[in-house]
Amino acid sequence: MSDIEKVKQLREATGAGFKDCNLAIKESGGDLDKAVEILRVKGISKASKKMSRDAKEGVIATSGDENKISIIEINCETDFVAKNDDFVSFAKELSELNNQNSSDLEKLNKSKMANGETVEDSLVALIAKMGEKITLGKAKTFSQPGSKNFNYLHTVVKDNLSKLSVITSLETSNDSEDVKAFGKQLSMHIAASNPLALSSDLIDKDLLQKEQDLVAEELKNSGKPEDIAQKISLGKMNKFKEENALLTQAWVMEPKKKVQDIIKELNIPDLKINNFLRIKIGE
C-alpha cells in the first residue's frame, strides 16, 4: 500500500486532516496502527489547549421513557459544530449511554461506544476533529418507583437533541390520559416559566438573600418611612417567591389559575410533582 493510500485510509479512520495524517504516516514509518496512536496523542494535546475556552453552545440530549428518563448537556463553542453530523451522532449515542448509566458521569466516561472506544477517548477524538472545546455538562436521571416521567424539547436540533429540554417526574398510580396530558403540559410550562424550585420553601436561600439585598437597595433611597419600606419589601419578596415556585406560578395555558389549582382540578388524590429539571444551552 502506498503512503498516499495509507494517508487516505488514516483520514477515513480518524477524521483528521490531510497534513496531520501525512505527518503521522511519516513519523510511524508507514505503520497505520502507530499512526493512529500518534494522532490520538496529538489530539489529546490539542484538546487540552482548547479546554480553557468558553463552550456556550451545544445540545441537550434526552433519552428514556415514562419509567426512566435521563438528560445530559453536551457543550461546544459554536452552533455550527452543534449541528455537525459527527457531533450530533456522538450526542445521540451518549444520551442512550447516559440513561443506561443513570447519569453517573464517572461510569459514563468509562463506557464503551459503538466504535469500541470509551466515551472519554471518543470525546478527545471529537475535540481534535472539530477543533473546538467540547464538554459534558449537567446530567440527571429520574427513575423513582411509582413515578411517571415526561419531557418537552424546545428548539429541536435533531430527534432527541434540543437547545432546551425539560424532564418532569409525577407520582401517581393513575395511568389515565389526563395524567399524561398534564405531564406533557407541565413540562411545557416549566420550559416557558423557568421555576427555581417546586415550592417557595425550597428556593435556594442564597438566591433569596440576593433578591432581598436588591430590594433593600432599591428602597434605601426611596424616602419612604421605615415601616412602609418594610411592608413593601415583604410584598416584593412574597411576589418573588410566588412567581418562582412552580406550584404557585400562573399556569401558562390559563394564567388566572396557578399550577396547584390545575392539580386540584384533576381530582386525582395521589397525584403530586416529584421533581423536575430544565436545562437550556447558554444558561
Swiss-Prot record:
Subcellular location: Cytoplasm
Keyword Cytoplasm: yes
Signal sequence residues: none
Annotated GO MF terms: translation elongation factor activity
Gene3D superfamilies, sorted: 1.10.286.20, DNA helicase RuvA subunit, C-terminal domain (1.10.8.10), Elongation factor Ts, dimerisation domain (3.30.479.20)
GO CC entries: cytoplasm
Alphabetical UniProt keywords: Cytoplasm, Elongation factor, Protein biosynthesis
tRNA-binding recorded as keyword: no
Family annotation (CDD domains): UBA_EF-Ts (cd14275)
Main localization (coarse): cytoplasm
Location of the region described as Involved in Mg(2+) ion dislocation from EF-Tu in the Swiss-Prot/TrEMBL record: 78-81
Cited function: Associates with the EF-Tu.GDP complex and induces the exchange of GDP to GTP. It remains bound to the aminoacyl-tRNA.EF-Tu.GTP complex up to the GTP hydrolysis stage on the ribosome.
NCBIfam families in UniProt: tsf
Family of the protein in this entry: Belongs to the EF-Ts family.
Protein name: Elongation factor Ts
